[in-house]
């Protein structure tokens, strides 16, 4: 697989059929991601946190805050999709979000703490879904698809 956009090293998301085993693996990813991020950055100093993770990319500091921001969006989108009939979600400009004062000034441990709480809620919510609940959709106007 040739990578044409370094922002997406594994490629852009394309929905595919999935097995129950794959779903359980994804649920485990959601459950344990905060631990993985915390462990990955635990021994980094401020200089390392201020280092871009790739040429032209965000710093590790920005990336940690971005994960918290994007996962809050994802959690809300899952809830909207569950509670409403194919709701249109609001896209957001991720590049603008990493320039806000909270991202610039707060330590990454704030977003790590947020991720632990958020992922506990998200995982519990997803584990409660049954059968056809997993077939519900949202509409993303930026991608113009469900």
For each feature predicted by the language model, list its residue ranges.
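Histidine-centered divalent metal-coordination motifs
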Residues: 66
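Aromatic-glycine hotspot motif
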Residues: 1-58, 72-146
